[in-house]
Amino acid sequence: MIVFNNVNKVWPNGKQVLKNINLEINKGELVAVIGLSGAGKTTLLKTINKINDISSGEILIDFDKTKEHYEVTKTRGKKLQKLRQKIGLMSQEYNNIANKTVLQNVLNARVSSQKGINKILGFFKREDKMIALNSLDKLNLLDYAYIRADNLSGGQQQRVALARTLAQQPFLIIADEPVSALDPILANQVMKDFKNINKKDGITVIINIHHVDLAKKYATRVIGLNNGEIVFDDVPSKLDAQAMKKIYGE
């Protein structure tokens, strides 16, 4: 569970981008965050793993499976590193290494599990290779394992990025505009991948997305932000014209 209690974020220039955010996100939800550019969507997501510090309030994270509890605002050092290992982070950039194979790119998620000379030389244990291959298999990408990343389409590269995130074995995935650069067919495929991972693996997914139609189609819950405030928080079927007006204005 993720809990936001009276969270505010003010930039050094005085602009307030998050205003009194009170929110609970439960394990197994697929949450789409929508709103205009500058509404605070990216800032909200990046407070979860403390890429962005908050100005006031608190963020609490409980991982039921491991019985671990984090008060994000007070988490730092090795404990913050441990928290971030449990949270997969994706963006619209694929962040693949162009001249490396798909498998090598996915294996990068396992670097933190390596020690000593293996970490220095980039050697991976058989267990890590199996985790990476299993992640590719879940996305039907095994046939691409030994193909260089720069030979793939944009949609395929984003799916490789998702496979890499899966290989991290996260409890939570936060994705910032993961389909904004994709055509409608590929965007649907990537969203379908998120949905399958959410349902089959029980991984909580929070996606910042501009495509309202995709949010309604794939999310179990939609949160609408307007000028840093939550103005809508409900199931997709309740996202009617009145709700859209609250989120996007006239």
UniProtKB/Swiss-Prot annotation:
The keyword Amino-acid biosynthesis does not apply. It is an enzyme of class 7 (translocase). GO terms for cellular component: plasma membrane. The keyword Translocase applies. Keywords: ATP-binding, Cell membrane, Membrane, Nucleotide-binding, Phosphonate transport, Translocase, Transport. It catalyses: phosphonate(out) + ATP + H2O = phosphonate(in) + ADP + phosphate + H(+). Its main location: membrane. ATP binds at G35, L36, S37, G38, A39, G40, K41, T42. It holds the Pfam family ABC_tran. Residues 2-247 form the ABC transporter domain. Its EC number is 7.3.2.2. It is found in: Cell membrane. It is a peripheral membrane protein. It comes from the Bacteria. Part of the ABC transporter complex PhnCDE involved in phosphonates import. Responsible for energy coupling to the transport system. The complex is composed of two ATP-binding proteins (PhnC), two transmembrane proteins (PhnE) and a solute-binding protein (PhnD). Belongs to the ABC transporter superfamily. Phosphonates importer (TC 3.A.1.9.1) family. This is Phosphonates import ATP-binding protein PhnC. The gene is phnC.
